Amino acid sequence: MTESVIYSGTSELISADEDNTETTRAHLLSFEQLQAQLKAQQELFQQQRELFNNDNVHTSSIPTLNHTWSFTQGLVVGQLSVIVVVAIFIKFFVFADSSATTTTTSSSNKDISGVIVKRNKNVRGTSNEDKDPNNNKEDDLNSPNLSKISTILEKTYYDVENHSPESLDWFNVLIAQTISQLRTEALLSDNIYHSLNEFLTNSDLPDYMDKIKLTEIDIGDDFPIFSNCRIKHSKDRSGRLEAKIDVDLSDTLTLGIETRLLLNHPRPLTAVLPVQLSVSIVRFSGCLTVALINTNDEEFLDLQNVTTPSPGPSNEPNSQNQTQQPTPVNNSSSRASHDVPSSSETKHSKAKRSQEDTGTALMFSFSPDYRLEFTVKSLIGSRAKLQDVPKISSLIESKLRSWFIERCIEPRFQVVKVPSLWPRRQNTREPVHSNANGIVDKTEEASI
């Protein structure tokens, strides 16, 4: 009984174990299935994740480009806005209003008068009651000039009435250097010979005179001496300041020529008379008057409007006195008194000439009590020669004196335009080489 019980218990235990084993196997199978499913799900999830990542990479590239383009647009818009703000600030806060530039002529003149500092003082003069009514207009015109001259004399401490004459030693040295340089250039390049020869060749000669040939040119070796300089008021109504300077020159300036006088009657070249002439200036002295004038002044324009009488020999006994009468002439361009512009000259050339003759100019003339000495040598004939004929000498000397009087003796004068003294770049020079003592050996133009 007991064995049956034990057997039955054992069988029950064995059956229970078998059940447990089957249950365990079932659980293991289900666990393996779950693991397989989980692994499959993980693989599927991994694939989905990879696909999702690929989709994210593809889709994220487009927003990045859009984001980059938006930043560029913002940068450009920002820069433009800054430029606009700066332009508005400069226009309205730095520059003036454009309407201010469109002012009238009167307001422009008013602004100019406010910029230029005028230091002219009112001139004290006599009342109109004490003046001649006929001279009121002239006095009104001359009063600014007289005031200016008085101011100059006052500020330079120069007394016209009591100032002693001055020597011009320094001026003599400068003039001597200039003349020496001109003589050197004339001797080296022979330009004085070529210019005189061209003038004589191109001159219109009468039919009875053959070609003129140069035989002697002597430009001298001495220099003029200027002395006894004094400043005086002009004798005319302008009252301008003039410098009176004594000039003395003792030198020999010679010009020698030879030609032939042709006798063409009754047939051409019937006879030929050789002529040799030599004219020398051996002494000149006189009082030189120098003044700076403005060619735009009314008094000078009045002188330009007066035509010069044609020079010619006068048979009247007082011809020399008539030459020295105060007849104003036009010597503004330092030409001969008979050089009157032809009627065929165009308006453009006249306007250009008038424009060139305006501005500051140097006026000079000599007093009538000058001294001019000549030495004239002549030789006429071929085989039998006449030497130093007095009549020929006096005729040539008279012509030369008349030529000089008609151009340079008061009241006539010569006018030389003064070049502009304003510093210019093209006139700038600089030393490029110097020796051990610091003396400049060579100069060249400064770079422009």
From Swiss-Prot:
Segments for region (Disordered): 119-144, 303-357
Gene Ontology molecular functions: lipid binding
Transmembrane segments: 75-95
CDD domains in the cross-refs: SMP_Mmm1 (cd21671)
Location within or outside the cell: Endoplasmic reticulum membrane
Alphabetical keyword list: Endoplasmic reticulum, Lipid transport, Lipid-binding, Membrane, Transmembrane, Transmembrane helix, Transport
Cellular component aspect of the GO annotation: endoplasmic reticulum membrane; ERMES complex
Domain of life assignment: Eukaryota
Domain annotation SMP-LTD: ranges: 164-419
Segments in the Cytoplasmic topological domain: 96-448
Regions of compositional bias (Low complexity) in chain numbering: 313-332
GO BP terms in the entry: mitochondrial genome maintenance; mitochondrion-endoplasmic reticulum membrane tethering; phospholipid transport; protein insertion into mitochondrial outer membrane
Keyword Transmembrane helix among UniProt keywords: yes
InterPro entries assigned: Mmm1 (IPR027537), MMM1_dom (IPR019411), SMP_LBD (IPR031468)
Topology within the bilayer: Single-pass type I membrane protein
UniProt topological domain (Lumenal) ranges: 1-74
Bias-annotated ranges (Basic and acidic residues): 127-140, 345-356
Job description of the protein: Component of the ERMES/MDM complex, which serves as a molecular tether to connect the endoplasmic reticulum (ER) and mitochondria. Components of this complex are involved in the control of mitochondrial shape and protein biogenesis, and function in nonvesicular lipid trafficking between the ER and mitochondria. The MDM12-MMM1 subcomplex functions in the major beta-barrel assembly pathway that is responsible for biogenesis of all outer membrane beta-barrel proteins, and acts in a late step after the SAM complex.
Domain comment as written in the entry: The SMP-LTD domain is a barrel-like domain that can bind various types of glycerophospholipids in its interior and mediate their transfer between two adjacent bilayers.
Subunit architecture: Homodimer. Component of the ER-mitochondria encounter structure (ERMES) or MDM complex, composed of MMM1, MDM10, MDM12 and MDM34. A MMM1 homodimer associates with one molecule of MDM12 on each side in a pairwise head-to-tail manner, and the SMP-LTD domains of MMM1 and MDM12 generate a continuous hydrophobic tunnel for phospholipid trafficking.
Family affiliation: Belongs to the MMM1 family.
Protein name: Maintenance of mitochondrial morphology protein 1
Organism, scientific name: Debaryomyces hansenii (strain ATCC 36239 / CBS 767 / BCRC 21394 / JCM 1990 / NBRC 0083 / IGC 2968)
